[in-house]
Amino acid sequence: MTEIHVLDNLASVDAAQWDALIADGNPFVCYAFLRGMEEHGCLRHDYGWQAHHLAIYHDDKLVAAAPAYLKGNSHGEFVFDFSWANAFERAGGDYYPKLLGAAPYSPVPGPRLLATNDTDKRKLVAGLVAETERLGLSSAHVNFLLEADLPAFDVRWLQRFDWQFHWHNRGYRHFEAFLTGLTGKKRKNIRQERRQASDSGLQIAMEAGSTISDSDWRALHALYETTFDMKGNHAAMTLPFFRHLGRSLGDRVQVATARMDGRIVAMALFMVGNSTLYGRYWGSVVEVPGLHFELCYYLGIEFCIANQLQTFEPGAQGEHKMARGFLPTRTHSRHYLVNESFDLAVRNALVHEAHSREAYYEELMEHSPYAPTRPRP
């Protein structure tokens, strides 16, 4: 018998059955990552997160799932709907809570409908709609989903897209081979930035999560917090969660470190999927020219080349990434708005937004670091 369950945490779920549904090894929807955030204080109600996962069981075996959350705000999502919320509430509605299918705090494209067939994916989408209407919510949203999941959503869901800057491995054998594909100006600039970092006197390396000591995890987390403190934001990921990642994911966590007399003074933390490297967190207590680019981008590119990974996704936003070999790549989201008048207004606005974002892509590609320009994604 097939049953759909709604879960307020993943404690009752078999980790192996959950992870078996993730075809691409995406670490941000794996059991250890999602359950770790629940267990180690990252998903707090006062931060606006309440787990509301969907799980489909057949004869007591998990056959499909959707990580989902009731959201009391739009923070930590990176698909911005603040203007939608303001408009809906000015009209007298309650936009929050809403239902969100996502990897919390992670603007990373990946599977959001964890299933091995299209039928179960459509059941998950229907489940999101049913929960939205059962709870009397304003809306449901699914952010940063893969193209393979898009057909599961019918026309009632609004389509939205944006751009991130990703690096693609063209079979490079080493970093210099990558540089040869760039324009001369970009190649010269990257070499200069790498030289600045190497001449700093800092010990720079990529370190596997399984080798990081407890004291180094404390140092890494303190650097992560520093970045958020500088911007006046709260750092949601806790030190116990960082330690948990090192224990549970091991070498699927990689950290680019800069050390001074053995002490970590700057870092960039990465996660590794089957074919993709994901850049997530950066922090530093030193100001060294070129160091940010070395840790966040160039060591990551070298890691991808050495390990034959096909894609490097260094994080959301940042046009400066283009000058360092990253090209605009389309990301997708889907949105279900219950109120039909509100749906129509947003649907019309998204048509104009799409035209603007297509024009933005054309403008960006006029400044491609590669010659000749690559085909459109």
Each model region followed by its residue ranges:
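N-acyltransferase acceptor-side catalytic subdomain
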Residues: 1-377
